């Protein structure tokens, strides 16, 4: 089977989310083949989960002072500070044989692909068991504070956070693989505000690719290894193809939604 691949490019927060939604909607509508996409963020941004309240979970004033965009995702989960990372999205229609018809099963398959990709980089990763969380600390709004079942750990520390949305027609899963991590910046924009205790706990629980290997790796090499991980675990051929004209038109229209304050503040 053949899958489509969109290689790493950096966009602003609103265009990133518009592209993912356009791919998802066109995949469901036209029963298109699955898509894997890698991307980055320019400028830095905070994405919030579909059900989160930015007023109570973000330091909005600090985001403004630092020039950090705020965008609401279609997927659930917690807030993520996007800076130096590779974000992935996987979109597939209902009945795609590579995935079970449930959220946790799909999470595990995608995590297995990412773990294999990391292994090609010499990084030994494993999946988090159910119920694991930071001891004696609640950083609830922050995605990387609490590894969920089937999320990816390196030496017990979370290196990737993911969230998923499903409809009757298919699913969209988004996730962030950290290249480097700055807990001071992350906690300056995501509540609770940084204290020495919060910073220490978060620093001890989060890993980043270029901090767990001997020397930094180029983003292109990382993406190639992750792509190979998907191809090998799923047993599919992955071919690089651009957005379709229909996806581009839809993306351009959806950008307006993601920029709209009403979308950012809805619950």
Kindly give the residue locations of the regions a language model identified.
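Catalytic micro-motifs at enzyme active sites that drive phosphoryl/nucleotidyl and oxygen chemistry
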Residues: 35, 74-79, 139-140, 164
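Catalytic beta-strand/loop module used to bind and position nucleotide/cofactor moieties
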Residues: 94, 98-229, 261, 267
């Amino acid at each position: 089977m053949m899958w489509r691949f969109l290689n790493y490019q950096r966009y602003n927060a609103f265009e990133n989310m518009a592209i993912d939604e356009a791919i998802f909607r066109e995949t469901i509508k036209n029963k298109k083949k699955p898509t894997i996409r890698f991307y980055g963020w320019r400028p830095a941004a905070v994405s919030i989960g579909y059900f989160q309240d930015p007023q109570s979970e973000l330091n909005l004033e600090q985001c403004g002072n630092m020039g950090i965009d705020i965008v609401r995702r279609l997927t659930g989960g917690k807030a993520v500070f996007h800076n130096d990372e590779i974000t992935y999205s996987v979109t597939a229609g209902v009945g795609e044989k590579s995935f079970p018809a449930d959220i946790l099963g799909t999470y595990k398959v995608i995590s297995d692909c990412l773990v294999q990709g990391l292994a090609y980089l010499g990084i030994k990763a494993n999946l988090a068991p159910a119920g694991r969380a930071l001891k004696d600390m609640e950083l609830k709004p922050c995605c990387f504070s609490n590894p969920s079942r089937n999320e990816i750990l390196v030496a017990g520390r979370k290196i990737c956070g993911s969230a998923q949305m499903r409809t009757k027609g298919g699913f969209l899963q988004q996730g962030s693989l950290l290249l480097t991590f700055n807990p001071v910046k992350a906690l300056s924009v995501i509540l609770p505000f940084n204290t020495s205790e919060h910073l220490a706990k978060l620093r001890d629980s989060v890993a980043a690719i270029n901090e767990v290997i001997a020397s930094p790796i180029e983003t292109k090499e990382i993406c190639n290894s992750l792509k190979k991980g998907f191809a090998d675990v799923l047993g599919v051929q992955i071919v690089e193809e651009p957005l379709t004209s229909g996806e581009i038109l839809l993306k351009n229209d959806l950008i307006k939604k993601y920029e709209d304050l009403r979308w950012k503040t809805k619950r």
